[in-house]
C-alpha cells in the first residue's frame, strides 16, 4: 500500500533516577554515599532508507518512543542509557510540527537527531558536603520530550511523467523500467504514484516517477490533485505524456492545460526542464506532420533523432542535447519531442538515451 502522509507521536526516553546507597565494608560502620547516576533517556532519530518508498509501515503504529534510562546503581555505578529509537523513513520525507517544516530528509542513509533523551538524575554521592556526610537524597531523571509530528512524503525521482488519465503513463513506465503498476483501458487506473528504475546500460540509469493522471483543477485540490502534484516537485526533468490518438482534445490543448495546472500549483515546478512524449503514435496516420507542427508550436528548433545516431523514426531533440551545441537552452524550451508507442515499444529504446541526456 502506498501512503504519503501520516501523523505519529514521537517521544524520547526519561532519564533514570539517581541511586541512594552507602558504602558497605567490613569494619566500616557508616560508609560514605556511593549512589550512582541514572542513565540518560534514549534519543529519537530519523534515518533515511533507500529501500522504501512509502510511509505504509506507520499505519497502525502511532507511538514511537525511545527507552527510559536505567536507575543508578550502588558503588557509584551509573545506570545504562536508554535504547535509542530509530525511525526509518523513505528519501523525500518531510517532518512537520503543525504547519511548520521541521526536517527535510533527502540524503540516503542520513540520520538526524530529532529528540534528545532526558538527563539521568545524580546519585547521592554528589550531595556529600562538610555538613552532610550521609545524604539521603538523589535526583530524579528528567522527563523526555514528546512531539506530535506529521510525515509527508515527496518522492525523489530523476524523471517525472505528467499527463491526463489514460494517456499511457503506466504502460510506458512498465515498458521502460522495472515498475509493475496496474494497467487497464479506463481513466484513473493509477491511484498512487509509481517509481521505476530505468537501466540504460550496465553503468547508466535513472529513476522515473509516474504520478496518477492530472485533471483540470488539480492545482486547487480537485481529485487528489495537490497530493499527486507534490510528488513531482523534486524531479529534475518533467516528461509530458500526451495522447496523440485523442480526437476530442488535441496534443496542443493537452499540453496547454497540463502546463496551466503546473503553473497554478508552483512556478518552480512549471519552470523545470521538460520534454514531450506523443504516445500512441502507432495508431495515428499523420504523426510526422503532427510532430513537426507541435515542434513549431513550441518554437523548438529541433533536429531529427537519426542525426545523432538514435532510431530514425520521427523524434526531435533540442540542440542542447547534442555535442555540437555548447550553450544552455532557454528554460521554457522543450528538450525533446518524441513520438512513441508504449504498447508496441516503438521509440522506447531511443527514449532511454534521450531522457538520460536530458538530465542535468
From Swiss-Prot:
Cellular compartments per GO CC: cytoplasm
Location of the OBG-type G domain: 157-360
Compartments where located: Cytoplasm
Binding site residues for Mg(2+): 170, 190
Record-level Gene Ontology MF annotations: GTP binding; GTPase activity; magnesium ion binding
CDD domains: Obg
Residues annotated for GTP binding in this entry: 163-170, 188-192, 210-213, 279-282, 341-343
Pfam hit, one: GTP1_OBG
Enzyme class: hydrolase
UniProt-listed Gene3D superfamilies: GTP1/OBG domain (2.70.210.12), P-loop containing nucleotide triphosphate hydrolases (3.40.50.300)
Signal peptide region: none
Cofactor(s) named in the record: Mg(2+)
Family label: Belongs to the TRAFAC class OBG-HflX-like GTPase superfamily. OBG GTPase family.
Subunit structure: Monomer.
Function field: An essential GTPase which binds GTP, GDP and possibly (p)ppGpp with moderate affinity, with high nucleotide exchange rates and a fairly low GTP hydrolysis rate. Plays a role in control of the cell cycle, stress response, ribosome biogenesis and in those bacteria that undergo differentiation, in morphogenesis control.
Name of the protein described by the UniProt record: GTPase Obg
UniProt organism field: Helicobacter pylori (strain ATCC 700392 / 26695)
Amino acid at each position: 500500500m502506498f501512503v504519503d502522509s501520516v501523523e505519529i507521536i514521537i517521544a524520547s526516553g526519561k532519564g533514570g533516577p539517581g541511586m541512594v546507597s552507602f558504602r558497605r565494608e567490613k569494619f566500616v560502620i557508616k560508609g560514605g554515599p556511593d549512589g550512582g547516576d541514572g542513565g540518560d533517556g534514549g534519543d529519537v532519530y530519523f534515518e533515511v532508507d533507500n529501500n522504501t518508498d512509502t510511509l505504509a509501515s506507520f499505519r497502525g503504529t502511532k507511538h514511537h518512543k525511545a527507552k527510559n534510562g536505567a536507575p543508578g546503581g550502588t558503588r557509584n555505578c551509573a545506570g545504562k542509557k536508554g535504547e535509542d529509537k530509530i525511525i526509518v523513513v523513505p528519501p523525500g520525507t518531510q517532518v512537520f510540527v503543525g504547519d511548520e517544516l521541521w526536517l527535510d530528509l533527502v540524503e540516503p542513509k542520513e540520520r538526524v537527531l530529532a529528540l534528545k533523551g532526558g538527563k539521568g538524575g545524580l546519585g547521592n554521592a554528589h550531595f556529600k558536603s562538610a555538613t552532610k556526610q550521609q545524604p539521603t537524597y538523589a535526583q530524579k531523571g528528567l522527563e523526555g520530550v514528546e512531539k506530535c509530528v506529521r510525515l509527508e512524503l515527496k518522492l525523489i525521482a530523476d524523471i517525472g511523467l505528467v499527463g491526463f488519465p489514460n494517456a499511457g503513463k503506466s504502460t510506458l513506465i512498465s515498458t521502460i523500467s522495472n515498475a509493475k503498476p496496474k494497467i487497464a483501458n479506463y481513466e484513473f487506473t493509477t491511484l498512487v504514484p509509481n517509481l521505476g528504475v530505468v537501466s540504460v546500460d550496465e553503468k547508466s540509469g535513472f529513476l522515473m516517477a509516474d504520478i496518477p493522471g492530472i485533471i483540470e483543477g488539480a492545482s486547487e485540490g480537485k481529485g487528489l490533485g495537490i497530493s499527486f502534484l507534490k510528488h513531482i516537485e523534486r524531479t529534475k526533468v518533467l516528461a509530458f505524456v500526451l495522447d496523440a490518438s485523442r480526437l476530442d482534445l488535441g496534443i496542443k490543448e493537452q499540453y496547454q492545460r497540463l502546463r496551466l495546472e503546473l503553473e497554478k500549483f508552483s512556478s518552480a515546478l512549471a519552470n523545470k526542464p521538460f520534454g514531450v512524449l506523443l504516445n500512441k503514435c502507432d495508431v495515428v496516420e499523420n504523426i510526422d506532420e503532427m510532430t513537426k507542427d507541435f515542434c513549431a508550436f513550441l518554437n523548438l528548433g529541433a533536429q531529427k533523432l537519426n542525426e545523432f545516431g538514435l532510431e530514425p523514426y520521427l523524434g526531435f531533440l533540442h540542440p542542447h542535447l547534442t555535442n555540437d551545441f555548447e550553450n544552455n537552452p532557454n528554460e521554457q524550451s522543450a528538450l525533446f519531442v518524441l513520438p512513441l508507442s508504449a504498447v508496441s515499444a516503438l521509440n522506447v529504446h531511443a527514449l532511454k538515451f534521450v531522457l538520460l541526456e536530458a538530465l542535468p
